[in-house]
Amino acid sequence: MKRIAVVGTVHEEKGLANAAGLLAILERIKPELIFLEIPSAALDDCLTGSRSDLESAAVSRYRAEHVVDLVPVDLPTPEADFFTNNRDLFERIERTSPDYCRPVDWHSQYVRAHGFAYLNSEHCGDLFSQLRQATDSAIESLADQRLAELYDLWIRTNTLRDQAMMRNIENHCCQTSFSSAAFLVGAAHRQSIITLSRSEPGAASSTVLWEFSGFLEEPH
């Protein structure tokens, strides 16, 4: 049985959500391979230490002491205008919706205060659900066709990414022998990954045991 621990992360260090905390989780999981939320084109930068995100820093420190394979599973990075448009979209929502700002602020506070224990909790998933509802309501209230289209594109893009990452992991499981792996993914994707792991079974499903929180505590 292949065990895959799905670890919800953030890409920038904030309080207890830091590289040292993620490294401690990796030391508990002891993965033989790590699935990464990056496209194949970014793997070289990760291997050479050129990437500056939290996950890359923790993985680099783990690789210094352990033999581990790194497997990129994300789709190619969208064009720059995708990110520019999304920044404009959410800045517009933030200026007009207190119901959106509250869960954003709460999330930031919880990440800083509780780190990975929060990022891999039902509480975090519930807060992202509140955030999605507040965003939906704000888009409806703004009644701006362009913003609605940008929001739909953002949702579709992330849905396709989640599906592709799970498909790529499953394909790798069919082709490779291992006992323990970690999947480092932004916490905003975590609930979708949980849902996909429980949906229509694929060829590797019977040989994969998904783990979503057991790695948070030291083994007894």
For the regions a protein language model found, what residue spans apply to each?
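Compositional signal for N-terminal targeting/processing segments
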Residues: 1-220
